[in-house]
């Protein structure tokens, strides 16, 4: 049996841009992608801490070191600049893998710079 498990999480990042007329997606600073082990075009689930919205889209790379978290297309209706988000990726794992798996959690500062990387639960 396969279980769908939390793989990685960007915790409480701040939305820096929302562009309704872009094709779609979520732009994420490459430093954050590397820290979380996330990849461009990977499906993500987003949880808006500010307004309670939950939605999904896919990742595109934003400039390294920019602190950018940009919501594009329809996703731009789900959050405003300044909102706090939790961004998660999930993946299938065997029973054996899931028994010992620890998701990667990236905590950020107010400028969306990596503050701490840890395995969850701490």
UniProtKB/Swiss-Prot annotation:
Cofactor: pyruvate
Broadest EC class assigned to this enzyme: lyase
Pathways involved: Cofactor biosynthesis; (R)-pantothenate biosynthesis; beta-alanine from L-aspartate: step 1/1
Keywords: Autocatalytic cleavage, Cytoplasm, Decarboxylase, Lyase, Pantothenate biosynthesis, Pyruvate, Schiff base, Zymogen
Keyword Chloroplast in record: no
UniProt KW ATP-binding keyword: no
Pyruvic acid (Ser): modified positions: 25
Cell compartments where the protein resides: Cytoplasm
Catalytic activity: L-aspartate + H(+) = beta-alanine + CO2
Cellular-component GO terms for this entry: cytosol
Post-translational modification comment from the UniProt entry: Is synthesized initially as an inactive proenzyme, which is activated by self-cleavage at a specific serine bond to produce a beta-subunit with a hydroxyl group at its C-terminus and an alpha-subunit with a pyruvoyl group at its N-terminus.
GO molecular function, one term: aspartate 1-decarboxylase activity
Pfam families for this protein: Asp_decarbox
Active site: 25, 58
Cofactor, how bound (note): Binds 1 pyruvoyl group covalently per subunit.
Residues given in the record as substrate binding sites: 57, 73-75
EC number, as in UniProt: 4.1.1.11
A biological-process GO annotation: alanine biosynthetic process
Superkingdom per UniProt: Bacteria
PANTHER family per the UniProt record, alphabetical: ASPARTATE 1-DECARBOXYLASE
Protein family according to the UniProt entry: Belongs to the PanD family.
Subunit structure of this chain's protein: Heterooctamer of four alpha and four beta subunits.
Role played: Catalyzes the pyruvoyl-dependent decarboxylation of aspartate to produce beta-alanine.
Protein name per the record: Aspartate 1-decarboxylase
Organism: Bordetella parapertussis (strain 12822 / ATCC BAA-587 / NCTC 13253)
């Amino acid at each position: 049996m396969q279980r769908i498990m939390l793989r990685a999480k960007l915790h409480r990042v701040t939305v820096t841009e929302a562009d309704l007329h872009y094709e779609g997606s979520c732009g994420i600073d490459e430093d954050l992608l590397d820290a979380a082990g996330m990849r461009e075009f990977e499906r993500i689930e987003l949880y808006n801490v500010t307004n309670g919205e939950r939605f999904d889209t896919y990742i595109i790379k934003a400039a390294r070191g920019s602190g950018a978290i940009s919501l594009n297309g329809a996703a731009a209706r789900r959050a405003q600049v300044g909102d706090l988000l939790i961004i998660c990726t999930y993946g299938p794992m065997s029973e054996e893998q899931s028994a010992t798996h620890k998701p990667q959690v990236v905590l950020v500062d107010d400028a969306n710079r990596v503050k701490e990387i840890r395995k969850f639960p701490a």
